[in-house]
Amino acid sequence: MRLITRWIPLANALASTMPVQVVASIENPSLLPTPPMGFNNWARFMCDLNETLFVETTDAMASNGLLEAGYNRINLDDCWMNYDRAENGSLEWNVTKFPRGLPWLGQYVKSKGFNFGIYEDSGNLTCGGYPGSEGYEEIDAEIFAAWGIDYLKLDGCNVYPKEGRTLQEEYKYLYGNWHEILSKMQQPLIFSESAPAYFSMTDNLTDWHTVMDWVPEYGELARHSVDILVYSGEGSAWDSIMTNYKFNTLVARYQRPGYYNDPDFLIADHPGLSLDEKRSQFALWASFSAPLIISAHIPDLSSEDLEYLTNQALIAVDQDPLAQQATLASRDGSLDVLTRNLADGSRLVTILNHGSESIETDISLDILGLSTDCTYKAQDLWGGSTQTIKDAIRIKLNTHATAVYKIDTDEKCSQVIPTGLIFNTASGKCLTGTSSSVGSESCNGSKSQIWQIDASGVIRTLSEQSKCLTADGKAISLQECSENNGQKWSYAITGNLKNADTGYCLTNGGGVSACGFETNSQVFGLPAGVHVAL
């Protein structure tokens, strides 16, 4: 059986005859107001995909509670197609793998209440060596529309710069072209971009930062770094999760409703993971408001796996309409503490034990941006129990386990000040302020590394709250707060922290210097809630 080889008319698949304005995805958050949830075959099955797998997965998700919990997307990955295009240039599915065809499969998936997604590549070949979309973008968009596809994952293998363009510029051209085509469709596809991943593993991260700057303008989500470990892969699955987790902490400033940072799939049945580690991946991804795309053998998921994957309290966090990504409030050799706001006015705190031993400790409320003069209700989002807290939350965690609490505030104690680490994303070093010096040090969890940033851009440490981060020439120090321009800072989407008086940017190691373009030493992560200038 051959594919549909007669293209549908361009006016039917793309925009109508009326002009359509091409807008950035972040300007149209209604296309994907919350991060996607669903299934993708890649990390579990790679190229071993077929119709039976997707039918059985669809049936299982419809009956085991995953669809009801919100996992409503069924997405194919690489290797679904033939090695050659049809004579008219259109893609053809592999009839051995999909004997009834992708239009039939799409109809089946949708009859069960799911959306249907597909994979292509922006280069001349996919990562598996199948036909890429370069030069065929409009043809492929038309055929995807004809098949009922509503989600496109566009990979970035086999991209080579044309004359006059750098590699980064070539990716921008290809993904920008796809954005224009998809934006003109009567029913635009959700656009998942993989471009940043191809720039994430270099020492000089300027191109990676640059790609991250433009992907929110073109699509609804972007894979920012390396692939998560596949089921048959060698190495530590936990280390792989931690690698992608750490990359995600570097890019929080980009996320907003309509665009989501994607740290890759939930590997829920990987044999190398303990239950605590699986639960941690889910809790961290939910705290990030990251895509929750499961790559596992769904029919064989255990009751324990299904229990955490369908945790409604954590799914509600993931799907919170603010879409604010949790950021680091504190980090040391064992614990990461992350915080964010939720749309109902509550505060989320997520505590990860990434160390090798169990730990029991108190998490002080002031590092969460909350007042220690107030009393709060804290709900454990794993078990559902609620406790009254005043100064701190007492936590006890196994190695590689994660706790998540939702802290309710009342009118008297509703003020939350963005609080947490200011860290250089290239070195991982934390800005550290004492009365004698301000510089960059390894993150150690001390309050001299935990900063509060108010709405006017004034920055102070928790350890010395009467003193503010001050620029004088190219030097920085803590000085008594006076709210002069030397103590006011602005944070840009590029990651630059710029002083209002000098016009210089904070630079790793201490001090300020002339602002460069996406230079490693001047890109910083700041707490969620700080205003980001676009």
UniProtKB/Swiss-Prot annotation:
UniProt-annotated catalytic positions: 155, 213
Example GO BP: carbohydrate metabolic process
Residue span, Ricin B-type lectin domain: 413-534
Entry's Gene Ontology cellular component terms: extracellular region
Leading EC class: hydrolase
Signal peptide start and end residues: 1-25
Annotated disulfide bonds: 47-79, 127-157, 430-443, 468-481
InterPro entries hit by this protein: Aldolase_TIM (IPR013785), Glyco_hydro_27 (IPR002241), Glyco_hydro_b (IPR013780), Glycoside_hydrolase_SF (IPR017853), Melibiase_C (IPR041233), Ricin_B-like_lectins (IPR035992), Ricin_B_lectin (IPR000772)
Predominant localisation class: secreted
Protein name: Probable alpha-galactosidase A
Organism, as annotated: Aspergillus oryzae (strain ATCC 42149 / RIB 40) (Yellow koji mold)
Organism classification: Eukaryota, Fungi, Dikarya, Ascomycota, Pezizomycotina
